[in-house]
């Protein structure tokens, strides 16, 4: 009898733990977390400015502001990835409820790659003048003075003009532009590149269990040139297997790694990326890493 009672109690404890674990997993699965950021980014929460960090949880009502040459990546549950681009301000209206996820782009641009939303899931991105609703797609929504744009790379987006209530379905390769009237055009090459990049970034399974370095190692190689700017000098040296010495006409010497050439050279140094006009460069020397 005693053995039977112990078994029943143990079974009850296991059931409670399993239920708690299930609820915890469900709660964790709905979290929105920072997976990467670069430059000047701040999270405005309850009137205070909070510095972002990888694995930081984003809450409903938070406003994220990215400065020039800056951006931030968010992962919502395991269903979507969002990139808030430079010079943008985006409010997290409702991200914790899978049935009604919503962003408000106050200015700038938000790129979204929606993987899965579930049977009753919904995701909406708004500006002051339009609403874009999706179930699964790669798209961007931008807000500038007197203009809102929705660009679609994959899937379809239902766009509604708030003032008139009129709607339009925007398909792959198309962009909906609203000023004082609505128009449709082909997505630009720049828009397509942006969306291709956000589409390549995965929704990381078990994100909450990953270390910051593990997340960084997953995301960084997928960011292209913007990822290089976020790397340390040692990481860039390892990537390119060299050190560059740049000698200027005014006698200055810059040591680092040249990460792009053209009318203006971009050079990764110990203090970050510096830009130097080509006409100011006397010559360069390359030292391969051993």
Model-derived features: where do they sit?
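Conserved RNA-binding domains used in RNP assembly and mRNA/RNA metabolism
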Residues: 224-290
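Bacterial N-terminal signal peptides
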Residues: 11-20
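Flexible, surface-exposed loop/linker segments and immediately adjacent secondary-structure boundaries
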Residues: 25-63, 67-69, 74-242
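Bacterial N-terminal signal peptides that target proteins for export
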Residues: 2-12
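Short, low-complexity interaction segments enriched in Ser/Thr/Pro/Gly
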Residues: 1, 23-24
